[in-house]
């Protein structure tokens, strides 16, 4: 039976996998990485497949799908193997009375992917709470313990792991706090859902519940029966600009260390692409989510090529309207737009 990336990713597109390895422990993962380091076979390492689109030609080398499951709580530190389901990490930390991850509830994927993307939601980003990580260096074959500040977290969704495939995350350690209150809630949608003022706090478990409700309402919690969740979540990155074009003067804006961050969903909808757009475009297999304009979705039967053509169509429309070029937030392998 040929395994394809349509079987392994939440977008459910992509061609065949050459050779698939699924290590179920950290030691098996390190062994598999050592083996691949001595081979000329191209290597692709993936976690939950929730932020990955692979082209229709697939990947003809080796794919390591990380399945390691070790999880340890020691005081205010939570250490997770790269393959642990991310939402399980959030749940366990809250069950242990630890606050800090609640705003990241419901995000699909594995723990090892969080520093790669510097995953964030509702005002919390991985780099806020990550203390250290165990990394495999594919060049030297060494395991290295890194402090979080070595990850090269810069602007939105960036890290050294996005810029090079030399290092593979094997384990992550978060420093949380024992608290009955969340950090200040700065997002109006979340504050409204919690019934508090912006800038107020709430019980971490209540924040988790509110975040899950908001994510479900936007089609951002995986459900195989719901085509709005056949996606990578946010497909486009929110652009960060030194200067906002006059045409985008009315766009909401947020502070970022590198400039002004604009919500890509606002730009997309104001460029003539409402939620659900695309069912009448092309062959109808790809559309924006009916609940969130930032999410490109597979309506059933789409190919990676269909997804790329549709993404280019949205990107070009936004650029024509506002002079701002959107790029992908997800990882694209053997495909582009």
Give names to the regions the model predicted.
Residues 1-144:
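Anion-binding (especially nucleotide phosphate/pyrophosphate-binding) glycine-rich loop
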Residues 29-34, 90, 191, 208-211, ...:
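A generic alpha-helix structural signal
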Residues 3-10, 143-306, 321-337:
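Phosphate/pyrophosphate- and phosphate-bearing ligand-binding catalytic cores of soluble enzymes
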Residues 95, 304-310:
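Beta-rich strand-turn-strand
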């Amino acid at each position: 039976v040929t395994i394809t990336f349509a079987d392994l990713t939440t977008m459910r597109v992509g061609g065949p996998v050459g050779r698939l390895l699924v290590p179920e422990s950290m030691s098996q993962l390190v062994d598999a990485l050592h083996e691949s380091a001595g081979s000329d076979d191209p290597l692709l390492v993936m976690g939950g497949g929730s932020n990955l689109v692979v082209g229709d030609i697939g990947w003809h080398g080796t794919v390591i799908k990380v399945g390691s499951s070790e999880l340890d709580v020691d005081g205010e530190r939570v250490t997770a193997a790269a393959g642990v389901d991310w939402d399980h990490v959030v749940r366990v930390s809250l069950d242990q009375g630890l606050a800090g991850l609640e705003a990241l509830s419901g995000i699909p994927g594995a723990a090892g992917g969080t520093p790669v993307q510097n995953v964030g939601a509702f005002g919390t980003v991985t780099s806020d709470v990550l203390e250290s990580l165990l990394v495999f260096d594919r060049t030297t074959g060494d395991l290295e313990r890194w402090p979080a500040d070595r990850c090269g977290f810069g602007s939105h969704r960036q890290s050294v792991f996005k810029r090079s495939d030399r290092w593979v995350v094997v384990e992550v350690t978060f420093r949380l706090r024992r608290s009955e209150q969340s950090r200040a809630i700065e997002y109006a949608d979340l504050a409204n859902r919690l019934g508090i003022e912006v800038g107020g706090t709430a019980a971490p478990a209540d924040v988790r519940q509110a975040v899950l409700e908001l994510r479900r309402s936007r089609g951002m919690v995986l459900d195989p029966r719901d085509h709005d969740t056949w996606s990578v979540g946010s497909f486009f990155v929110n652009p960060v600009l030194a200067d906002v074009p006059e045409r985008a003067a009315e766009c909401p804006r947020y502070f970022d260390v590198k400039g002004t961050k604009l919500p890509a969903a606002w730009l997309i909808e104001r460029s003539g692409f409402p939620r659900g757009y695309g069912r009448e475009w092309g062959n109808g297999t790809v559309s924006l989510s009916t609940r969130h304009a930032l999410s490109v979705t597979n309506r059933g039967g789409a190919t990676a090529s269909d997804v790329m053509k549709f993404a280019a169509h949205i990107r070009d429309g936004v650029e024509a309207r506002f002079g701002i070029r959107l790029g992908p937030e997800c990882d694209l392998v053997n495909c582009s737009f």
